[in-house]
């Protein structure tokens, strides 16, 4: 995975004046000084975390430029747990992706003890040596947990890496840091936040969320869900977006957990885009240890499953949106909503095409209400059913963040007389929603269904080019 960028200090962020094309993000880990003031609002001041999970970070110095900040992270369950993961679809799958797949397949999603992550080096396209390095990381955590594996194929810890592609890990440094991290395992908010920092590369802030909830079978029992993620560039799904680890103390069987994660990811981490590039390393893992007790979720037909699906999907969307808000060089957070589609898949495909369009993204950066670019993207969307897009019944509008009336740009294929002053005011805001109505504004019109698809993306700025032109420096 290419994200060798960590918070502003694991590789310091150098902020340049606007005349110098904005901020250059060198590999750096976000710290209290380097985090932009505008991003501080996304960092939680407190949290409630799932029982039985302990986390920690430690400094290994994976990149020589990092002399003090944590770049190895551990998320461990005190007891064996169920686990599921969704991985990148990139053909050049990194060593940690391959090893984690093997661990899950060997154990059928059961008996997993945690995840080990390093930032600063992706361990991708590194041959057999890279695979051995990833296996050693997993085995080292098992050893620290007091459950040493009987061999490289019998480990119980998933592995993730993020950083520059094509370089071998400084594996001795990492193996030396793992026991240090393990000795510091804790469940406090500050420890969770520090661990979220340790997995960053060019991120400008740590991405961490937690929440409590109840389930129908146990209305008086409190459950917790926590998640951390990293990513700011090389973000485009299937499944390729970033690294993410979600933990819950709900008892869930491996098969039900896999179904829950697949549904949630399709509507969250697989519905975001920063630059349209699919990474080699990206992984989202979900761990459930059942430490809070109660009735186990074992089938997809129970009320608890339905409730958990809604809770997990909403949570994953919030976590994924933090990645977009930290997009490299981004100045805007855009939601594109395609409605009145015959199917969710078609609506999502159209929304994805709009989100990937460089012309749409640059127009939004320039605060230009150039809806023709949006229409163009709708028109060339691939893989959708015949008759889904009919120009004469297509409408496009901007939905302002302040809740005021939509600014209609196109109605039933006919352009509106756009109030350019109002359009300019709307585009000054950081947040914007683009609404594409495929049914001419009438739900179910002319046989269309009422399905909708959502996508979240950011704009393209001068800074994006600067950051990625200097990525390895």
UniProtKB/Swiss-Prot annotation:
Listed under catalytic activity are: N(2)-acetyl-L-ornithine + L-glutamate = N-acetyl-L-glutamate + L-ornithine; L-glutamate + acetyl-CoA = N-acetyl-L-glutamate + CoA + H(+)
Primary location recorded for the protein, binned into one broad class: mitochondrion
> Where is the site Cleavage?
240-241
UniProt subcellular location: Mitochondrion matrix
Keyword flag Acyltransferase? yes
Function in brief: Catalyzes two activities which are involved in the cyclic version of arginine biosynthesis: the synthesis of acetylglutamate from glutamate and acetyl-CoA, and of ornithine by transacetylation between acetylornithine and glutamate.
Q: Where do the catalytic residues lie?
A: 241 (nucleophile)
Q: Which UniProt keywords apply?
A: Acyltransferase, Amino-acid biosynthesis, Arginine biosynthesis, Autocatalytic cleavage, Mitochondrion, Multifunctional enzyme, Transferase
The text of the family note is: Belongs to the ArgJ family.
Pathway(s) the chain acts in: Amino-acid biosynthesis; L-arginine biosynthesis; L-ornithine and N-acetyl-L-glutamate from L-glutamate and N(2)-acetyl-L-ornithine (cyclic): step 1/1; Amino-acid biosynthesis; L-arginine biosynthesis; N(2)-acetyl-L-ornithine from L-glutamate: step 1/4
Record organism: Ajellomyces capsulatus (strain H143) (Darling's disease fungus)
Assembly with partners or alone: Heterodimer of an alpha and a beta chain.
For this record, an example GO cellular component is:
mitochondrial matrix
Top-level class of the enzyme under EC nomenclature: transferase
Which molecular function term from Gene Ontology is one that the record holds? L-glutamate N-acetyltransferase activity
The site (Involved in the stabilization of negative charge on the oxyanion by the formation of the oxyanion hole) lies at 162-163
Consult the record and explain the modifications the protein receives after translation.
The alpha and beta chains are autoproteolytically processed from a single precursor protein within the mitochondrion.
InterPro entries listed in its UniProt record:
Arg_biosynth_ArgJ, ArgJ-like_dom_sf, ArgJ_beta_C
Q: What's a Pfam family this protein contains?
A: ArgJ
What are its E.C. numbers? Answer: 2.3.1.35, 2.3.1.1
Name-wise, this protein is Arginine biosynthesis bifunctional protein ArgJ, mitochondrial
Name its GO BP terms in alphabetical order: L-arginine biosynthetic process; ornithine biosynthetic process
